[in-house]
Amino acid sequence: MLESLYKNVKMGSDSIIKLMDKVSGQDFKAALTKQIDGYEKIAERLRKHLCSMGYQAKEENIMVKLWSSVGMAMETLTDSTDSHLAQLVAEGSSMGITDSIKLLRDYENTSVSEEALAFAREIIKFEEHNLEVAKSFI
């Protein structure tokens, strides 16, 4: 579960970093910078927790990252306005919420640690906040 959460937050951070060059509005750029910082802080805590358990934190494989980059390039090819970029960020946050809820539901009645479940709940709240912020720029 923790490995999946780590991959999800790293993918969120990486995706927004790739969009930053296209953002024109300073308020939107500041909001995205704050979001990246939040992702990276959660990822670092997850990485440390995984290492303390003897696991290595791994990001998505290169093919998943490549397809994500291609998809993002296609989405912004004809429309790279801040409003459209905010829509993409909102869609990404919605996916993050859905993925984290699914992980939470799959593991909440198992022997997985309460700390792992707490990470999932934290990410859901973080992504819900990110979604609301993104909607304000659409």
Regions found by a protein language model. Give the residues of each.
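Carboxylate-rich helix-loop segments that flank metal/cofactor sites and access channels
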Residues: 48-98
